[in-house]
Structure formats: structure tokens, C-alpha cells
Amino acid sequence: MPDWLLTLLITVVKAVAVILALLTTFAYMTLVERKLLGRFQIRVGPNRVGPMGLLQPAADAIKSIFKEDLQVTLADKLVYTLAPIIAIGMALTAFGGIPAGPEGSLFGENPWVYNLDAGVLALLALTSMGVYGIFLGGWASGSKYPMLGGLRSSAQMISYELGMGLSILGLLMLVGSTRFTDIVLWQGANGWMILFQSLGFALFLISSFAETNRTPFDLVEAEQELVAGYLTEYSAIKWALFQMAEYVNMITASALMSTLFFGGWRGPGFLNGIIPGIADIPILWLVVKIGFFLFVFIWVRATLPRLRYDQLMRFGWKLLLPLALFNTMLVAGYIAFFSSWGWWPLALLSLLGLTALLALSDTVRQLWNAPMTRRETELPPVPTRSAGGD
């Protein structure tokens, strides 16, 4: 067999394995989320299908596949059908660039589907392209509420993609590479990036909630305002594909935070002194870290209320973006003037930046609780007709 064909075959097998793992995780993430939300709200959660409700994801999948697929008369049928495929396709493709271990650690093969020189930039580009599926789905539905949800998704992505990119710019300046494997190896030699970029991590975490359209930034499908946003006119398997894309994006965002700030596949080194070799099991530690951040996503959903749309935009442009620029300037100043002092000045500067963010809590609260704009508060009253007629 030619080498190129063998390489292609191995890549296809790894891609299929990643897709199956993501879809299985998505299925049981829905169950875990409903169970945890039930605990948070002092109720039981799904417990009827199978032992302890463990077969609920299978029941949901069968229901989605065999439900009637309704379609609005005015919908653009081609785009309406392609939109969920684009959303899930971008989500699945993005995760393939996350390394699950060092080179050659997967039965002699590399534990990733692709490892580009510009891996971080490529993954951010792929995750941001998922918004095309949401916008096109809203536009092609032929209804006003999905269209509003699609427009919100575009504005939200533009606002928070800038903050997300700038929040990791300092990290990339320190490492000097955009390859995920180089970033993990750098952390193995110098310590987890969270020690030196705590402010950058806080900003990236907030941006991740907005990028994945999760509470408190789930404005694109706000039930109280837009019925279900871009999902209003979708049903059956097309609706399930959009839900699948959302959860896969959550998994990808969790893997990104684990890789960029928490050492990726590496476990805490001090554990080797307790149980020899326990910190050197690559895939195990990546899965544990991803699971932790998925719990954070669910925890925040159960805790925080949804923002208003004007609060969402104000928070992104007036607070998140300036702080991300400030963090980048801190790292640039460290590299220019203090790099010969070691890593402790950078850790101190990052901690001071995070303290400044906490010190701005009053400003954050003002942005959060700001009144609506003048135009919104001074809308003319809606004329009414008397019930008795003329």
C-alpha cells in the first residue's frame, strides 16, 4: 500500500473515531445536563427510560429521527436544509485539531486528526464559521423571529470573537508559536499558563460562553423574546443537528481552555510523587479537564439569568475588548522590559490585572444593570381599538 494512501486511511479512521466520540458525548451530555439542572433546582430529572434514565438519549434520538419534518412555505428549502449541516460540520471539524497526547502516543500514531502550524488560528476560524449555519438557518426560515435570532448571532459573534482572539494573544506572544503541541510542551517546561495568564483565561472563559450561545449569552434563542430564535421553524432531525452543534462547540471550547491554559493532556506533576506515572496518562487528563469545564457551562446556566441584548453588546465592546487589549499590553511590556527577571513578574502582572477586573465590579454591575437606551424607553404607545366597535 502506498504511504500516502496509508496516511489517508489512518487520518480517516481517526476522524471517524473523533466524530463517534463527540456524538456519544453529546448524547450523554444532554442527560447529564438535565440531571444536574434537576439537582440544582431540587428535582429528580430524567429517570423513566432505562435504569436511572440512562437510555433517555437513545429515546430522544429515535424521537428526533422519526418526527415529522415540517417546513415553512416561504422557506428557502436548499439553504434551510444546508444550515444545520454547516453548523454541525464546522463544530466537528474544529475539534479534530485538539491534540489528545504527545506525538506517537496513540498506538504509534499521533493523537490528533490534523496539527497545523497555525493551529490556534485555524481552530478559532472554524469555530467562528459555525455562525454561518445559525444565520443562514434564521434567514432561510422565512419567518421574522428566526431572522432576528440569526442577526443576533452575527452581532454577538463579531463582538466576542475580537475579545476571544485578543485574550489569547498574550499567550501566543509568550510561547512564540500557534501550534497546540508547542503550547502544551511550553507549559510542561514552565508551568500551566493559568499561572501567567489568569486575566487572559478569565476573558477567554467569558468569551467562550458567548461563542457557544450559552447562558447568560443565549440571546439568539431567547424563548421569552423570540419564541426559539433561529430554531423556531426547525423540527425533527434538523433541530437535533443544531442542538448537536451547540454541545459539540461546548466540548471544543472546554478542550481549548484545557489545552491553552491548563496543560492540555498533562496532569499535575506533583501527583507522580503520590502515584508514579499517574500524571503521564495523556487522554485521561484531557477528558477530566474537559469534563470540569462542561460542568462549569451547566453550572452557569443554572445560576445566572440571561442578559438583555443591549447589555450583551455593551459588555463586549466596553469592558471585554478593552481588558483584552490591556492584557496584551501587559504581556508586551513584560517581554520588552522584564523577561530577564524570570516568570514571577508576569504572574504578578497577570494577577494584578485579574484584581483590577474584580475591582471594576461596580462598573461591571453598571453595565449589567444599565437601563435601556433612550429610543427603547421612549417608544410611542401602541394605539388600541375599543372592544365595542363603532
Curated annotation (Swiss-Prot):
Give the GO biological process terms.
aerobic respiration
For this UniProt entry, which segments traverse the membrane? 4-24, 78-98, 120-140, 157-177, 191-211, 247-266, 278-298, 315-337, 341-360
Which of UniProt's keywords are assigned here?
Cell membrane, Membrane, NAD, Quinone, Translocase, Transmembrane, Transmembrane helix, Ubiquinone
Indicate what this protein is called per its UniProt record: NADH-quinone oxidoreductase subunit H
Job description of the protein: NDH-1 shuttles electrons from NADH, via FMN and iron-sulfur (Fe-S) centers, to quinones in the respiratory chain. The immediate electron acceptor for the enzyme in this species is believed to be ubiquinone. Couples the redox reaction to proton translocation (for every two electrons transferred, four hydrogen ions are translocated across the cytoplasmic membrane), and thus conserves the redox energy in a proton gradient. This subunit may bind ubiquinone.
To which species is this protein native? Deinococcus deserti (strain DSM 17065 / CIP 109153 / LMG 22923 / VCD115)
Top-level EC class: translocase
This entry's Enzyme Commission designation comes to 7.1.1.-
